[in-house]
Amino acid sequence: MILSPIEQSIKRKIEAVGKPLKDWDIQIYRGVLTGCNEAFIIDEAKRAEILSNCQSDDERERTEAIIRPILRGRDIRRYGYDWAGLYIIGTFPALKLDIESYPSLKQYFLDFGYDRLKQTGDKGARKKTSNQWFETQDSISYWEDFEKPKIVWGNLNLKGAYTHAPAGIYVNAPCPIIATENLAILHILNSNVADYYIRSLGVTRSGGYFEYKPMFVGKLPIPLSIDYLQAFPETPSEDQERMLQIMIYDIYNLSVEERLYLETLKY
């Protein structure tokens, strides 16, 4: 990509500050890949049905513990999300669950269809893996990070839209997560500076959409001294957002001309 002089200057200034996000003491993961969302992502009514079919309080408690709220990319917006009342059945291979300890859940999966859920690569089944038929396609060895506060975002978007998600909320693939509750990082990611830099690393699709892959987001240089940005709430007001933009322009030492360029940039 050939950059104009002002674009070269902006890029140079961004890269002169801090270190890439991927080099911080945090992890960036993708959301849960089930291999069959129709079976593993359920609504409130189906959740209630599965729980009501449990034969004991212990079974119900075990089952309820692995059915967790989930967000999709379309549910996530800048500094917020609109939960659609959906849940994921978290039978992750990393948990090494015994399906016989979850009779109601086992029957639900069998009613859905063993041949559709088995991970053999056969026609009509899920792709071949070493996981069991009732488990998700990915092992999700990092499931504990979903049980902590985190930053999440939709993978494909017209503009970067990051939000804080509380402990216990999951996201489905390809939505990524950053296992941190650092609000300063959240505010940096939602800035015009970050959006410009991240989009410069890939190709904008037809209609202006961009795929905010972890490999791109992880390359964003993050200043080392940004703790004072944590004074702003996880859902700032419009006035606070404007203040954050100005402060982040200052952090990256952008000139008035460069700020105006980013403010008026169209993709």
Task: Identify what each model region corresponds to.
Residues 191, 226-267:
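Amphipathic alpha-helical coiled-coil/heptad-repeat segments
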Residues 1-229, 250:
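Polybasic, glycine- and aromatic-enriched phosphate-binding surface used to engage nucleic acids
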